[in-house]
């Protein structure tokens, strides 16, 4: 036996497999202010104790592997390992537990959402000892937050750029989402902006297809913006989707948007990736562009209740990576979203400091230490009858986006925009006068429609529209 082998054996190295909980389950651990804290919903396989399952998550998302390795002796596991420090059963669910894991900050590269997610939600989600695993929430320490730029501008700077205060902003996604020529697309943009909307939007899958190349779309939309601004005296914008197949092409499109003098561009941050998104956010801050973020693909990740990742985690990641707007659900439209849970992550997007509140899905107190806020965007199956509820639920710091609810107006695009603007102004005025939007909302809309034929026509078209499907899961 060589001296080296004898030395290693003498310090206690023993090859083989041992339970994760012996090393990674530490219920006496006191979390540090610099730790990243994670709350996982864990569903162990039959026969796997919850402590072992929670420890396995901590191990496989930090320093652990399936067997003991001799190179463990070359570093300090106590310094670098993740720790499962608390486990609690999920009320009303069989064999589901919330496992709380603390990660030392040294495990993560500064300013990199990509690296953070590669560790915390990487290979561990395919681990055989778990039937299902869901990341419910993260506590990002202030020391780590300060390594990120965050949103290019934030809520207050955006309002100052647009000179719009005291109300939600209004938007519209141009439909049909695919198939229009650039000129017809620009015409729809102009009509909606002229009618009273603040923004129009590329749909998330509008990039640079054969029927409408990106440069042509950018040019016709810029023309529409300038014409609408001249006629209305208001600052207008269109979310020009810069998402592309490469980061270089994405930046090239953003550069062209800046050269046209438009105020805002757009990115699909999940399909485009966090590295690309952070690069674009940095470019937007340096060059005075606002950045609208679409969350296409989020439901693949967040819709299952016991596996994947809750959108509040994706929302926190977006605030770190950078974006001035992000889609957040509506509570009232065609897309899924529970009111209290949705408002929980809306507050995580906008506010500087958010207290732990399990009733709203917030597992940890979060301090954003001066990182700018993000405007939540309510979009998907909403129309004028929803305006009172949306105004009450989301408040002033939001974007209310009506696609079909604008372009589906029987008189055309501009009257559809007029109807939405009148409905919004009526709701804001009623709220400022002390009226109860939740109780008097329909009456407020009916009163406003008496002096707005465009709103009256919209009210008639969408009076019976509902999106109610029984939930089977």
From Swiss-Prot:
Site (Transition state stabilizer): 334
A family per Pfam: RuBisCO_large
Residue(s) carrying Phosphothreonine: 330
Positions annotated to bind substrate: 123, 173, 177, 295, 327, 379
Propeptide positions: 1-2
Cofactor note: Binds 1 Mg(2+) ion per subunit.
Necessary cofactors: Mg(2+)
EC class of the enzyme, as a word: lyase
GO CC entries: chloroplast
Record keywords, A-Z: Calvin cycle, Carbon dioxide fixation, Chloroplast, Disulfide bond, Lyase, Magnesium, Metal-binding, Monooxygenase, Oxidoreductase, Phosphoprotein, Photorespiration, Photosynthesis, Plastid
Single Gene Ontology MF annotation: monooxygenase activity
Purpose of the protein: RuBisCO catalyzes two reactions: the carboxylation of D-ribulose 1,5-bisphosphate, the primary event in carbon dioxide fixation, as well as the oxidative fragmentation of the pentose substrate in the photorespiration process. Both reactions occur simultaneously and in competition at the same active site.
Subunit structure and binding partners: Heterohexadecamer of 8 large chains and 8 small chains; disulfide-linked. The disulfide link is formed within the large subunit homodimers.
Note: The basic functional RuBisCO is composed of a large chain homodimer in a 'head-to-tail' conformation. In form I RuBisCO this homodimer is arranged in a barrel-like tetramer with the small subunits forming a tetrameric 'cap' on each end of the 'barrel'.
The protein's name: Ribulose bisphosphate carboxylase large chain
